[in-house]
Amino acid sequence: MNTTVLAKLEHISLTAGQREILHDVSLEVYPQSILTVIGPNGAGKSTLLKILLGLRKPDSGSVWRKPGLSIGYVPQKFHLDRLLPLTVERFIGLSLPRFDRMRISEVAGITGVAHLLQQAFQSLSGGEVQRVLLARALLNQPELLVLDEPGQGVDVNGLGELYKLINQLKQHHGYGVLMVSHDLHLVMAAADQVLCLNRHICCSGQPEAVSRHPEYLRLFGNGYSTMGLGVYAHHHDHKHDIHGSVIPLTKEQSHG
């Protein structure tokens, strides 16, 4: 793995009113490596991505991005007015300052949607939409891809192919990838590093180690089932070392 850091977050914390969104979260993203953030709904995953992208400011902590870093972003939610007549080619081209058919064809070929370029965007399936959004994210030759739930709306058969494509982008083009996903069984197969988040870092490391970690099992149970993803009631009666292991707080620390 290339050890040049593309972007990093250090000790990020954020609250909204009385609700703690993130507490003391740190991470680093490297070229040619996939870091996947997993966790239950409401764990702060999408917020964490927005902070790294500069779309939201934390209350404390620091954000660093490599100078001149080019980022391709696929958001969790995307809506296009179904009454707007737009081909896939035109939709991808909206991200360019000047329409460049050759570049559009190139990224469409990389993501497997070249045959869809003249189709209406509104006619696409969920899996096709995600591949088109990924093609658009590649237009400006990014060093880092930030993908928020790229498997959303994709059927079971298409999920494996989508994650295979993301892995190929990492291997063949050297992209760093920071991804949020709920598809635990596929994440564990595709990611180089996994960070389990529930407003704080529960555990992190290589997928196999994370899948055996007590905090991961506490959230998700045995295996990679996505059932029962409710947020556990978290009281700061512990903290974690750099490997995600639980360190009990002293009585003074837990009330401080």
Regions found by a protein language model. Give the residues of each.
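H-loop/switch region of ABC-family ATPase nucleotide-binding domains
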Residues: 181-182
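ABC ATPase nucleotide-binding domains
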Residues: 212, 219-256
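Catalytic Walker B motif of ABC-type/P-loop ATPase nucleotide-binding domains
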Residues: 145-149
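Conserved ABC ATPase "signature" region
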Residues: 101-116
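Conserved catalytic motifs of ABC-family nucleotide-binding domains
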Residues: 141
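Conserved ABC ATPase signature
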Residues: 120-124, 128
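H-loop (His-switch) and adjacent beta-strand-loop-beta switch element
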Residues: 194-206
